[in-house]
Structure formats: structure tokens, C-alpha cells
């Protein structure tokens, strides 16, 4: 079946902001699909609210819309662009849910748009738990006993009938949100109540428990002619009961017999057939009872998913690209296998290596959250590693996680930790074996298959052998084949990593590189995609004689280092290719565009450690290595690379050192006459109190050695400082604590700047909406800035110029500053690309990272910018040609862009939602408008926090904020909002003549503030933190060894109730000010205006 000629224009919906359960894998899938559809001759329109994506770059489609992903905005885009078809299978759960809404509300029919890639009926059969169960039973497939309920009474009755434990799964939610496992009635009440709120249709499925069964997934593809292939089988090392996104997974599956696999394969075909998936990729999950072999179908996703991204990277088979072509009528035997170039996509991939994926967690960012893993996903990223054996792949994957220190284990409670898995579970399994437990005991507690446990125990036995035979060459060779790093061997031998490397080199123990080719080396691959192994002789990565640039990626997604850095990496790759170099990418993250087989010239899927990078350098001998695009990951290993003679291009390592070292940086600022907030260091509690007294409170404290992840805090009093130092940090001469004067009421600015060593260009000058003290990664920001005077902007440009020249920046840097009383303070400078680069590039219409990369290989800045000149500059400034001054003109777009963040608080009930100096957001959205108010309102809608235009507001304002907040609340009252307030706030409002209803605080009478929220009477909560509300850990609740730290102040209860009830909330005066402007704009008329991204640059 050739391509469909009845379709010309296709609308693709992206997945929106990165959240837990829906991450960078959808940018990877989307980008692949857009490329495929364009090359097949279709016009493509893409809509996504996330600017930090390659798929929203204008090169990949005919029209890009960065707009909120809601039905109202999508209808406007459909009305304007008139697509023939909508492809909803590339944007995760978000896009599927929207497709269902657009179809059911009649919008698709009204504009004559047809769904391709998945029919409405199929989406519903796969997503609606009750329908899915019925469909499976009709197809003769076994599913778990379950019942759909919409109230607590029915849930309790069902659980009694099935017997505890039971699994609770809310309908139509992402990453298991709101679900869980209930072992008793009390837990059931809690989970069901939450699940009914989280489910958009307010139903949950109560399901019999299969905890401890083995979990498998098949990634399958089917075309319109009925051809069906299994791309990859994936085995979860962790048994059922842990979300597959939080499980360690292995491909291909290791413990299935051939008979079981064939049975599963046949069942998968029946599933796809029964659901009615005619074309595209699907992911099907099975559970197998290890005792009886009983197999049940758990669920299926009728779209590309996290697992399909993993399967694509594991096999080299590009599922998303092929699914997109199948959706427009191609069949598998008409599509080439892009890796071999010789075979067809109808061939099932076969692989001669093992792939291990391990999730990356950051629970320390969410104190108060339960650390135990369950059916609700909690990890923020993942790594993948490839080896010839399971042991080798596991070893490589563990070091790819980039966990700086071994986790602190609670050795008195090993058995509890084995029975209740937490993110440290692998460390506990190793600890159990080191402490003499046997495979059988560990299996009983963990229910992990004995085969995996025997492999892990063998590694611990090898540790003993290493200790006994120190410096034995054969044992060293064996350890390398089993995936041990030089660093781990060095720790066992108590020598330096360098010593082990020297011994290895002397005995010629080197890895060889093997190719990922989809066909177990049966055909020759065209696309160079490699992994290292010590279990091989022949090196398949033969270097070319071209000049090469090697780019170090950013490793697993984590908070503070996410998809934005991958965006920069990819732009870097393209820039070096355009300049005639061979671009080599090194990364370990399977979710990303940078690890796509056709992004770079050569891809090494390897851990980002000194050892692994040096081995690739030894093989490829690049002209230079780029460390400025991957966030902190490459910077952390830069020193070791330089010591080994690796050439780092761009900003020199000396400059990186100065910027990263507080004392050196402060000296440099002093030398060039710039200010930074006064600071001091302390090595004891007494010194800390003295430094703070000299600086004057409030102060910002950060220890150089962190315990329990509470890295930074703003402290207002000596008592708080003393408590902080005793509880949250180790303070000793070896581990000093840094204390900065905290600038209250300052405006914080974020500057992305590019320089070629002579000219300096501020690409983006952003103003943070939250006050200084909220981490810039968690604050919304606006470009161009809204509250800076003409004089101040000129002053900022000169300051940046002076600092960039002094740091000798070549390429890109990010500078954070604060402005207080018209004085400029430098907070920090990062000699690398920052997380705002994609946002700035989309706001100004100039690819900032590409320009920075070309500068690193010798191009000049005015020459590169001339292609985009003239671009809009500040009103009143006139620039005829670039290069008259060393300070190149700062872009000043006529449209306003707001970046807003998305923080996964609802995944971690128990965590306080206050913003502070510790970053916790996982993703971002962008709102574009003709003024700040419109842009902010759209950004809030896109972030899932839409502001109300009517209803009641609950206000409880700290004394220090009343002066600024009361007039703003009065303004909302004038706009017709009803105001409820606690006693002190109400009094202040009444003195301003505002009509207000007084509500008792908790414990001061009923109905109190919490009752009001629970009754659903409030449409917006405004609550700022008061200084008498302790901002430190106080009470602890929960059973050993899973103590949960948390605070239970009234403010905390109000914030968490608002979060739980999905009521929008504002926690700072700045956010309130922005919200008032946005609400006023929304009340004046619709803000549902959509604009093509490229048009916003021409305004």
C-alpha cells in the first residue's frame, strides 16, 4: 500500500512539559516522526507547549505553534491551519487524551480532520480499564480480576471480596499517578480518595494483586496489511508492584524459555488485533506467575512510549519513524531498515548483546515523601548501557547514573529494605550478599528472579577474589569483562584510579567497540552506533581520517539538568557538521534526540566517566572535546581530561576553574570592579554564627558537604542558623560552610551570553518573576525584561562585557545577577550553556547554541550574526551595522515570552510546595503574548495551573508581605472575586476597605481554612510564608526504617490541600502581582490567540 494521497497536511501534538512519567523520549519520537513525514512529502504542523524541544525547531515542520495544550487552543490552530489529519500517537498520554477530547467534542468532524495512527475506538479500548478487560476476555486472553469503581464504599467491598493486597489504578492518568498498592483498609481509603481526584473521569480500577510475579514487555509494530513484528522483548528485573518506569529493565529478556516467549508473542498479536490497532507501534505488558507459569495481560499503550524509545535505542530499530510512515499508509515491506540500508523494516531485529536500563531518582529533593517504590512512578530520568553480558551491561549502567557517592545504607535493616524496595535497592542486594545472605534468602524477600541474583552474587564473590589477589592481571581482566570500572577496582585495591589505568595499559587490557546493527552482525551497518566491551577481540569502530569534534552529552535527566542540555548538544552537533567536522556524540541517556542513530556522525552509547571518555578519545583522536553543552556532567570530568592531555575547545579550563571556585571568582570580580553579595565561610557552628552576624540576616547558607539533600536554606535568625547547621550539614575544617548575605527584595536576572573572545553578545536578558532566593530553575522568567530602566540595561550590558572578557569566555556562558536599589550584584557565572538556551533561541528566533558552537571552531560573532541582522533591538536604539562596538546589540523581541516551570509535587504527597533555593522542577513551558500579562496567563494555562477569572480567593499573608500584597488583593476584590482570609490578613484588608470573610485557622474553630478548601469553594489560594513558620525539618512520622521527615504547620496544610484538590496557588507576592495582571487581561477578552512561532519573530 503506497502512501495516502488523500492527506496533505498533518497536525502532530507534542507531549508538553517534561514531568515524571513523560520525559524527553517524546521529543525524540516526535522529531523522528516529523523528519519521516516531511521526507515522505507531507506538510506538517506541530503544536507543543515545551520550547526546550528539538521538535519545535522550525526546520522540521511547516508550522510550529508553541501554545498551551488545551482543547481551546488546539481548536484555534485547527481552524487556522486546516489540517487533513491528526496524528496523536507521538505525544504520550497528553496527546492521546487531547485527541479523545477533540473527537468527542465534535471539533475534528467540524473541521474535517481524521485521526490517523490510532482510531478513537482503539484508544478507548486500550485506555479505559473496564473496556480493555472486556476486550481481552472476548479475545480469550487472561487478565487480572478487577472492578471499576467511582466511590469509596464500592472500593472497600471489592477489596474484601478479592482479599488484600489490592492494586489501585486511576483511569486515564500518566505514570501511575494517584495509584498504589493497599495492604489494608486504611491504606485503601487513602489511595482511593486520591485516585478518584487524580483521574480525569473520577474512576479507579481495583485489581487483584500480582506482587512478586515477573513482569515483561513486548514492543510490537503492525502495518495496514496485517504484517506484525516484535521489535524487542524487555524483562523487568524488579517484579510486579513497581512501576515499569522505576524498574531496572533488561533487553532482550533473560529468563523466558522459548516456549513462553512464543506464547507471549501470540498473545501480543491477539491483543493488538482485538484492540483494533491497524498501524503503528504499541507496548504490551505481561505478568507471569513464576510458580505456575500463568500469564496475564496487564495493559497496553497504543502509542510510542518510554519503553519504545528504549527498544529503539536498544535495537537500532526506529519505532517512532516507522510508526509515522505506517500511519500514512506505507507497509513494513516498503520501508528500508535505516541502519543496514540493505534489509527492510519487516525484518525483526536480532541482537547479540545485552542492554540494561536503570532509573535515576532524586527523592532527596522532596523531603517528606515516602521513599518506597510502588505502582506510581517516581524516577526523574534513566540511563542505558550495552554490554556483551548481563554483568558487563549492569556494571556500565550503574556507573552511568553519575551518583557521586555510594548511598548511605542502613545495615541494621537490610531485610526490611529488601522487602520494601527503595531507589537504593541494588546497593542493598549487594550489601546483603556481602553480609553473607544467600541467593535463596534474597529471592524470598525481593522476588527478583534467582538468575539475576546469582549474577549479582558472582560480582560480590569477584570482589573477594580481587581483595585476595591484589594486582593480579588475570583477575583484573576478569573484573573488566564483568563491567567493573577502574575506579571500583581502585577502591577495592586501595590505590588511585590512575594506578589501575596504568596497570591496564601496561598489560594491553583495552575495550573494543562493537556496533549496534539490528541484525546480530549478519549485514553490514551503515550508521556508526557503538558500545564498548572487554568481551571481544575485533574493534568495529574504525576511525575515519576526517577532523573530528567530540561532544560530551549530559547523561541521565535529573532535576537541574534535563532536556534543555540535550537540545544544546544536538545544535552543537549540527553546527560542527555544517563547519565540515565529523561530530562524535557520547551519551548514556536513551530518551534523547542526541542518542538517535542519525543525529551525529558517530554515536558512542557510553557512561560519561573519565575512564570511558578517555578510551573513546584513544580510539577516535578528536581535534577537540566540547564540555560546555552537557550541563555539569562534562565540567565535572574536565580537569581529569585536561590532565591526560585532552584538548578542550571553547572556554579554557583555567577560566572554568575560576568561575566554579567561589574565592577565585570573588577575587576576579574585585579586580575588575564588580560587586557580588558579601559572603564568608565557616568551619564550626560558632564561626557560622559570627559570619552571619557580620553579614547581617537574612543569610543564604550552603554546606560544601550535603547530608539528606537539604543543600541550601535561607535563614532569618541565629536560632534557625544553629538548627540548620546541626541538622542539615557536616561542618568541619575539611567541609566549610558557605554563608552569603541574602539580598532581600532584589530583582534577579538571568543572562545568556555568547563571545568569540573579542565581541560580546547578550542573546537573552531575562527577568525572574520570583524574588531572589527562589532557585532560577524554579522561577518563571520573562524576556524581554519588564521592570528595568534604559540606564540600567546599558549598565548591565557593560557589566556583562567586562566579566565575559575577564573570564576569557569563548563560546557560551550564563550569568546570574541581582539588582537592588539600582546596584548590580553578580551572583554567579557558569562557563557553559544554561537551561534557558532553548527558551531564548525560540524567543528571539536565533539558534544561540549553534552560533556558540561555530565560535569554538574559530568563526567570528559579527559574521555569524549578520545572517539574522537586523533583528529587533531595544526601542530607541539604532544599529546600522554589527561590529562598530565590541558590545553587539541585545535582541529585544516585540512579543513577550514567559518561561514557567512544572514541579512534580503531586507525585510526592507529603512534600511542601514552597519554593526555595533548592531546585525541584522537572520541566518547563513557554507562553508567548503581545504583552507580559498575556504571555504569563498562557504560560500558567500551559503549566496546568490556569488562573481563575471568577470565584473565591483564600488569602493568608505573612506580615512582611502585607504592604505589597494587600493592594493586589484589593484589586482582585474590585474585579469581582469574593475574598476569604485568616484573621491577621482580614484585618489588614478591612483597613483598606475590602469586604472580606474571616476564616478560622486550623484549631481555631470549624469550618476552618482546610474545610473551606475541601468543600471546593475556593478557586485560588494566595499564601506567603511567614518567618515564624519554621522552614526546617521538625517532626518525623512513619515506621522505622522508613521514617518520613516533614512539617505540619498550618501553612503547610493549606498548601498541600490546595495541591491535592488541584486548586491553583500562589506562594510569593511576585507571583501574585503577575497573576493579577494576567487575570485582568483574561477578563478583558479571550487570550486564546494562536501565532506561528516564526511570525512572532517578525512582529
Swiss-Prot record:
Keywords: Amino-acid biosynthesis, Arginine biosynthesis, ATP-binding, Ligase, Magnesium, Manganese, Metal-binding, Nucleotide-binding, Pyrimidine biosynthesis, Repeat
InterPro entries cross-referenced by the UniProt entry: ATP-grasp (IPR011761), ATP_grasp_subdomain_1 (IPR013815), CarbamoylP_synth_lsu (IPR006275), CarbamoylP_synth_lsu_oligo (IPR005480), CarbamoylP_synth_lsu_oligo_sf (IPR036897), CbamoylP_synth_lsu-like_ATP-bd (IPR005479), CbamoylP_synth_lsu_CPSase_dom (IPR005483), MGS-like_dom (IPR011607)
Positions of region (Carbamoyl phosphate synthetic domain): 542-944
Start and end residues of each stretch annotated as Oligomerization domain: 403-541
Residue numbers binding ATP 1: 129, 169, 175-176, 208, 210, 215, 241-243, 285, 299
Task of the protein: Large subunit of the glutamine-dependent carbamoyl phosphate synthetase (CPSase). CPSase catalyzes the formation of carbamoyl phosphate from the ammonia moiety of glutamine, carbonate, and phosphate donated by ATP, constituting the first step of 2 biosynthetic pathways, one leading to arginine and/or urea and the other to pyrimidine nucleotides.
Stored HAMAP family: CPSase_L_chain_A, CPSase_L_chain_B
Annotated domain remarks: The large subunit is composed of 2 ATP-grasp domains that are involved in binding the 2 ATP molecules needed for carbamoyl phosphate synthesis. The N-terminal ATP-grasp domain (referred to as the carboxyphosphate synthetic component) catalyzes the ATP-dependent phosphorylation of hydrogencarbonate to carboxyphosphate and the subsequent nucleophilic attack by ammonia to form a carbamate intermediate.
Designated name of the protein: Carbamoyl phosphate synthase large chain
Annotated organism of origin: Thermotoga neapolitana (strain ATCC 49049 / DSM 4359 / NBRC 107923 / NS-E)
Taxonomic placement: Bacteria, Thermotogati, Thermotogota, Thermotogae, Thermotogales
